[in-house]
């Protein structure tokens, strides 16, 4: 039996690592899952891995923005004397495999695409090599990026994609997150994405491994079995579907699939439960969403609005008209379904008029929590390829940057991000806190309706309205400032004044949100809200758990 250490973010149960862990267990290998959620975890994670002395260290490199952290971890392992095999995996590692193999000799290999079978084969080969004392013939393993004797990258053929019906279910060690005593756990009912958005690496990743067939689904009976098992063995009542596409193309097919899943769950005698899903605006259909809420008990649906500007929809290749965004929000409002969304306010082609269009959308959907930011250039995406072809990128494969389409748009972006950074991206970002507050409310309303007052639900919506409209006011102020060609000498005073106003609004909302959380906790009388009552809060399923997740 070999020991394998798996390193990655465990802010919630990391399904990619946990599927690999269960596949390794099925092959007779032991694993330790070592959380590396933030910079402060680095020393603990490093000492933990060194103490384990594993034959293989697998590092999850799914998020490009954290690539430096995880590559530094590999370097630190070597500096501290670790001589075993270090492999990387994930979206970014797959796309940047040749560059990483070239630039980081500390990395032994990269597992490309879906890696369950690749990691098992790699571990088996390392174990065999340890027994015989001969080098492992790794070039025979599909799905690896290796290094030739002269240092050049060598990519073995693409791996065979695992059969979702035969994969061992993900390792569920450790305590789950909980909200008012109701366990929360992520799962997937499918893999892949049938869309082709220009800014997203997910579709490109699956297209690379399975051209033209990049979306696979599990049978509903298999999904229902997993849900019931988790409820019975771990106390899971809230199931968060992390599918890139929980919805399949076609409203009729979605209605049939969701109805079949509800039937399967009822047949198995599942207790009271709730679901959380993600949807595209084009997925939002009255009949489908009625089943989603009434029979699958959906308490939160993230809707991928992304932008309401026609130009943005074209640049991002969303292939849905802006009117569909409003229809989606109107239906969520009619069903009283908690919805949240993000807006990619800045993209390579954004104009001031596009900004104003999206500001109007924030006001239109003000009671639904939202956030905004810039489109980033991720490895493997069509948008990155386009920007490189146009000569508009700077940086390197670790982090590409670009300028917006005009100096005035660059100015709007710079001023906005300076003023809004704390609200949108800070450690205590209120835009995320509000999403968590609404999640707590919906959990309470669904599982404890007898104690939840209607005015608490309205208070949650009102806090979102205040924040959304305040943000819209702030963005409009930035646009006005830029439109009048205000001199640069006025920028600091303007941003400081705007930021001060934003912080004052945030303080008022934060106080009311804490009071609301206390009311919920006291009324329910068991467990805690998912968002902490204090300065450090978490978005749904983004609560860092300082739990050592070892076998």
Explain the meaning of each model-derived region.
Residues 2-7, 42, 46-55, 106, ...:
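Radical SAM enzyme core and accessory elements
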Residues 3, 9-10, 16, 20-23, ...:
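Glycine-rich beta-alpha loop elements in corrinoid/cobalamin-binding modules
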Residues 20, 45-48, 69, 73-77, ...:
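A general structural detector for well-ordered alpha-helical segments in enzyme core domains, enriched
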Residues 55-59, 65, 87, 224-225, ...:
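Conserved C-terminal portion of the radical SAM core fold
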Residues 97, 195, 249-251, 311, ...:
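Flexible glycine/acidic-rich beta-alpha junction loops that bind and position SAM and/or redox cofactors
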Residues 100-118, 289-300, 357-372:
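Structural recognition of alpha->loop->beta junctions
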Residues 141, 146-190, 507, 546-549:
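N-terminal [4Fe-4S]-dependent radical SAM core
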Residues 165-340, 360:
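Radical SAM [4Fe-4S] cluster-binding motif and immediate context
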